[in-house]
Amino acid sequence: MDNMKIFDSHVHIGGTKLGFDMTEEMVSEMIDKYNISKILVSNCDSAEVDHDLNPIPMEYQVNQIKSLERAINFAREHKDRVYVAAWVKPLGETITDEFETMIKDNLDIIKAIKLHPFHSNTSPVDERCIPYLELASKYKLAVVSHTGGCEAASPVHLYEAAVRYPDIPFVMVHMGLGTDNTQALNLLGKADNLYGDTTWVKADVTKKAIEMYGGKKMLFGSDSPIDGLDTYMYNKTGDPSIYREYMNGFEKEIGNDNYNLLMYENSCRIFGV
């Protein structure tokens, strides 16, 4: 792992109200320990509904400006290594002048809009999300979106958004979490600007995606440090993580060129870094 470049496109801070403990200090230690070259980080404090799709009480919510400010401050401490996906709140907020200015003034580190159709229970093609897609188009940002777990988060809705906005790169995070990924795999081939990531996706599914569509459709992502400092190696129970195969031996399965695309180059291209 010491000689490879890794761009983890799915890293988090925050999330206390969802039961997570993901601090900037933990992420900093993690990327040093595992020699991660670059990361794209989003702040889970922007969640609007809980794991049961119940609204998080307003007194416990963090507005999207404060959430983004925390992520920006973290990225500024790690120049050219930490980039930001701005996790937005379409269920209860809108784009204000202040929010757009914050995006515009930090385009050197903000590289994506983060949608979470589960934790906002709002589809990417819901009218409340459209202004955020317009914002991504205006500032040439990618859109990374959770898929899976509820109807609003179905991969088909991200595909619909990709068709509507062909200028925006869309990343299907999880490829349909909790499914066999078949729907997401099929959708990958239907839009040139639609991509997948490896977060909780088995390596054989990623290999199949590469066999079906070539090496430029999948990005490495992990949800780190959701299972702790060593998410790349172990899950919360101490059993081997799904990411071990990606980091140890997967290069032999898909070839050097495809491996470099998956683990580093695709994210650099899609996020423009």
Predicted region positions:
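An N-terminally biased module of ancient metal coordination in phosphate/nucleic-acid-related enzymes
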Residues: M1-E69
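Conserved, mostly hydrophobic/aromatic
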Residues: H10, I31, A71, M102, ...
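Active-site gating/metal-coordination segments in enzymes
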Residues: N54-V144, L194-Y195
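H/E-rich (His + Asp/Glu) clusters that bind or coordinate divalent metals
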Residues: P169, G176-V273
